[in-house]
């Protein structure tokens, strides 16, 4: 049986830390779905269509990576897709408590789904989408922290605000 994994997140924006986890996950699992969360409570920098477009473009040459969207409970989505594994990235100890709680709740909701934690390459351990958005909003450079396409789209957004 092929192993299907789901890597969920808002990916607003997609960072090189995310890309690192996804590409390494693609080597570990037969297929990995980048599942972009629809969250009506957040005001995203990029629209859902933009985030999907970016992710599909970044992984266009990696056939084992699929990009999809979901809303609602992650374990319900994972079950509907027939996946066996949730992939989560851990950058620092500060991520662990939240991820630990989420994993325990997911296990309670569906014992058939496993969670695998992956550490990003050390050069990406401090990068988060929130930090990228903050640096961008204050006029800072994010080169090397996000895929080139994300950097271009950020520049476009900055130009539209001027």
Language-model segments: which ranges?
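Nucleotidyltransferase catalytic core that binds NTPs
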Residues: 1-162
